[in-house]
Amino acid sequence: MIDLTKLVTETRNPNTMDLDQMTPLELVSVMNQEDLNVVAGVKEVLPQVAQAVEWAVSSLEAGGRIVYFGAGTSGRLGVLDAVECPPTFGVSPDVVVGLIAGDEKAFVRAVEGAEDSLELCEEEFKKIGLNKNDIAIGIAASGRTPYVIGGLRYARSLGCKTVAIACNKGSEVGKEAELAIEPSCGPEVLTGSTRLKSGTAQKMILNMISTGSMVGVGKAYQNLMVDVQQTNKKLVVRAQNITMAATGCTREEAAQALEQADGNAKLAIVMLLTQMPVDEAKAKLEAAHGHVRGAL
């Protein structure tokens, strides 16, 4: 049995020993101060995060997927990052996948014992057809979750690039992966509650991986999300704003170009900047593998 008391995420924080006696302002102030350690901890592992981004770009370019998997809060964070990619970057929902121990119902309610299975993640990987072109990213704050360990072992056996994200140095999951990302954020404000600093660190890292990989495959022009999907009125206006910002055109011109481009802001931008008709602009974009700069 693993001695949890030896894990930093399970030790008591000396700065919050009187947590139950603090005023609301004192409590939120100490939490805010402790969160500064998260930023510092993530900064220390940026080279490893950058490596994960490079691998993710390579996987996407090879037709593979980014597959996050974890249990509890860690699994929920992976799902959260995955589901934001289609509306933000215009990708299919199966390009960035989030798996949580206990399946979708575990997102809103804990499924007891699901994380303790070494075989469960392998079964789920087989259901989605995990293959060597995919990058498998296991997330476990403690770094010892059997669900994640089993998933990493199976992914490695297929030849996938494997990444482990944990908040304890020298973690068990880190030893199972080709790349370990292990930010040191210190003990939690509330002892063992890894939804706090550990969860924040994991979310920051996942933000970097998904954003960096999508930028790497041409889903941004300058700092504009040019593949945004117009799924509601707000996003229709945003697509117009993005087109205007990228080209300097008027709102009317942006709306007209977007209509001709079937709502594709990236295509509308290339049309406006090159003064090409839609078919020629589309061919330019395809030749540039979806990169706006390459099409100009």
Model-based region annotation:
Residues 30-38, 98-109, 221, 262:
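Gly-rich Lys/Arg/Thr-decorated short loops/hinges at beta-loop-alpha junctions or inter-strand turns
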Residues 61-62, 157:
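Residues at the C-terminal ends
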Residues 67-204, 213-217:
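Glycine-rich phosphate-binding loops that contact phosphosugars or nucleotide phosphates
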Residues 213-296:
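Short, amphipathic alpha-helical interaction segments embedded in low-complexity terminal/linker regions
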